[in-house]
Amino acid sequence: MNVLNYTQKLKHYPDVLTSDQAAEILNVSKQTLYMAIRNKELHAVKIGREYRIVKSKLIEMLVS
């Protein structure tokens, strides 16, 4: 898939995703998502106790 396809597919999600939403999109557990964040495979920002993932960064990861 290319960027446009993912953008269309994910248009109903907000621009900044929670870890639950990102895990749902990737079809992985939250633990697997956190491992990808720790390994710097996915860029995320920790706000309080929760990670936030910019949707465009998630799409970049999916395309690469």
Model region roles, listed by residue range:
Residues 1-25, 31, 35, 55-64:
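Basic Lys/Arg-rich amphipathic helical interaction modules
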Residues 26-52:
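Major-groove DNA-recognition helix of helix-turn-helix-type DNA-binding domains
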